[in-house]
Structures are given as structure tokens and as C-alpha cells.
Regions:
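Short, acidic/turn-prone active-site loops that include or flank metal/cofactor-
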Residues: 53-59, 109, 217-220, 269-274
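Acidic di-acidic motifs
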Residues: 80-81, 147-149, 232-235, 247-251
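Substrate-recognition "cap/lid" segment bordering the active-site pocket of phosphatases
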Residues: 196-243
């Protein structure tokens, strides 16, 4: 499976700017991710932007603040229409042609280097693939394993995560985060089994449909922490399923799940796809030094080891 983030999209458009016709004076975003791509491209190229329905209806497009004159926007002479994938490109070309609008059709990610109806493909990216801007709409959700906290809702704060009254309040009032538009195959959470009723109630209130809810069957939060069961439980549930993807909020757990299951994990903290191959190429980052450790390192650099040692002896008295 291939994954592309919004950062990947922006980088590709930046690197491909020289491939866009120089005479472009209007960028049109085709429905879906094409609108996002067009927004980025019009800012990079410093030209106005419109959407497909607006230009077909003859509505004027907005002029960017960087335009030198303040008069009305002139009729576009060279239109570039952008889609994130090939879906709908042929239809868009036909509709633009029927309206007498000549346009260069750009597909950001095509199945191959050539796409019917497109003049330019920026990157060949075969299926299966998933994008940051549409992962909660992707058909893979119907078979995927998905975390709850940090994905469907915000993580509890330290104060809320007390395994008591504050946590019960969190479970019923958690703020929604990413909203799926499809039924999720399996929800896999390290929430304790004793909180199933509250979890199911919140999911129902949010209108989130799913096939199965897997929860950690341990007596307490303290026992869960003692066993370090978060990642291993999720990994084993994922490994035993036929799910092709796990969506996890936290990088450390995503790496653990990918390592133990041998299957890909979409990490929302880094917006990257974690696999055994990526783990082999990029070992885990070194722990971030503590504030005290950082201060000591700065002091040694500024004062030198001898003066730092002298100060330590002085204040130890």
C-alpha cells in the first residue's frame, strides 16, 4: 500500500512547478482532493483559483492579494484543471470542452504515467494507495483496524485519565476528531473492557458504524501500564484479523504494532505508513533529552567541564 500526506502533495507540486504551462492564468480544482491540490498550486504559481462548477457557471474567480492591479479579473486565457487522481478527469474534460473552455488537465497521482483524458501526470502511484486528505473516506476502512483515542476522538488529558470519575466523564463527552464516512471494520482500543458500555454509547451518539469493538480485558489502568499491553494487544488483534491496514494515532505504538504484526500501520502522529521495511530503514528516534539534561549540556558547552564541576562542588555544600 502507498501513502501520501499533505506535505508529500505540497512537495510534489513544488517540484513539478516547472512542468505547469508558464502561461497559466487560472487554476481550477476538480472535485475532491483536486481542490486541495489546486489551492496549493495557485499559491505556488501566484495565479487565481476557481472550482469546476463555478467556472462552468461563468462565475468570476477570486483574485489573489498579490495581484498588482485592483480591477476586476480578466477572462482566463489558459486554464489548468487539477485532480488528485484520475477519477472524474475524462468527464471534467468533456464538460469544460462543452463550455468552450480549453484547459490543461493535470492529474497529481495516476495509476501509471499516462491517464486517459489527462495531459500531465505528476507521479505514477499505483493502487492500493491512501491519502491524508481522504483516508476517512477510503473503502479500506470497511476492512481496517482503527484506534479510537487520538483518531476518532481526542486523547484524554492526564487529569481525565484517572481510571475513575474523571475518566468516565471523558468517555461520554470526548471531543470528536476524525469523522469516518464509512463503516469501520474493527475498532481496536486499549481502553479497558469494563468501559465497553460507555464506549459503545459514545460511538452510537457520534453515528460511527463498525463491525467489531476489541477492548483490553484487564482489571485496571495500573495493570495495563505494568504489563505495557497497549501496543502488543493491538498488534495481536490486527495480526489475527484479515485487515489490510491499522490506523493508529501514536508513533511509538504504530511502530510496535507494525513490528509485531508484520502488517502496515498508518500513523497519524507522523502521517506516514509504518511497515517492517520502513522500520528497517529508519530505526526509532533517540529519546528526547529532558529539560534538565539539555540545560546541563548547554552549561558544559558555555562554561566548560571544569567550571561546571567547580560550581557543582560549590552548591553541593
Amino acid at each position: 500500500m502507498h501513502y501520501r500526506s499533505i506535505t508529500d502533495l505540497a512537495d510534489l507540486l513544488q517540484q513539478s512547478l516547472h512542468r505547469i504551462p508558464r502561461e497559466t492564468d487560472l487554476v481550477v480544482g476538480l472535485p475532491g482532493g483536486g481542490v486541495l491540490a489546486a489551492n496549493i498550486l495557485c499559491l505556488l504559481a501566484n495565479v487565481p483559483m476557481s472550482d469546476l462548477e463555478s467556472i462552468l457557471a461563468g462565475r468570476s474567480f477570486s483574485v489573489g492579494r498579490t495581484k498588482l492591479d485592483g480591477g476586476p479579473a480578466p477572462a482566463a486565457q489558459h486554464v489548468v484543471a487539477v485532480a488528485d487522481t484520475a477519477e472524474g478527469v475524462a468527464e471534467a474534460r468533456a464538460r469544460l470542452a462543452a463550455a468552450g473552455i480549453a484547459a490543461t488537465l493535470v492529474v497529481v497521482y495516476g495509476d501509471g504515467p499516462d491517464v486517459p483524458g489527462a495531459d500531465l501526470v505528476l507521479e505514477a502511484l499505483p493502487e492500493p494507495r491512501i491519502f491524508q486528505w481522504s483516508f476517512m473516506q477510503h473503502p479500506v476502512l470497511e476492512r481496517a483496524c482503527v484506534d479510537i483515542d487520538g483518531v476518532l476522538c481526542l486523547d484524554p488529558t492526564h487529569a481525565e485519565n484517572d481510571d475513575g470519575a474523571a475518566y468516565l466523564e471523558f468517555l461520554t463527552t470526548a471531543r470528536p476528531l476524525y469523522r469516518p464516512v464509512r463503516r469501520i471494520g474493527t475498532l481496536v482500543t486499549s481502553r479497558l473492557e469494563k468501559y465497553r458500555a460507555e464506549t459503545e454509547g459514545w460511538l452510537a451518539a457520534q453515528g460511527i458504524a463498525y463491525g467489531r469493538l476489541a477492548m483490553l480485558d484487564l482489571p485496571s489502568q495500573a495493570e495495563r501500564i505494568r504489563l505495557g499491553a497497549h501496543g502488543s494487544f493491538k498488534a495481536e488483534t490486527y495480526r489475527q484479523s484479515d485487515a489490510p491496514l491499522f490506523i493508529e494515532s501514536e508513533n511509538r505504538q504504530a511502530r510496535r504494532i507494525a513490528e509485531l504484526s508484520g502488517k502496515p500501520v498508518l500513523c497519524l502522529e507522523t502521517h506516514s505508513l509504518v511497515t517492517r521495511e520502513t522500520l528497517a530503514r529508519a530505526p526509532a528516534a533517540a529519546p528526547v533529552p529532558s529539560t534538565l539534561g539539555t540545560a546541563k549540556a548547554i552549561a558544559r558547552g558555555l562554561l566548560g567541564p571544569a567550571r561546571v564541576a567547580a560550581l557543582k562542588r560549590r552548591f553541593a555544600r
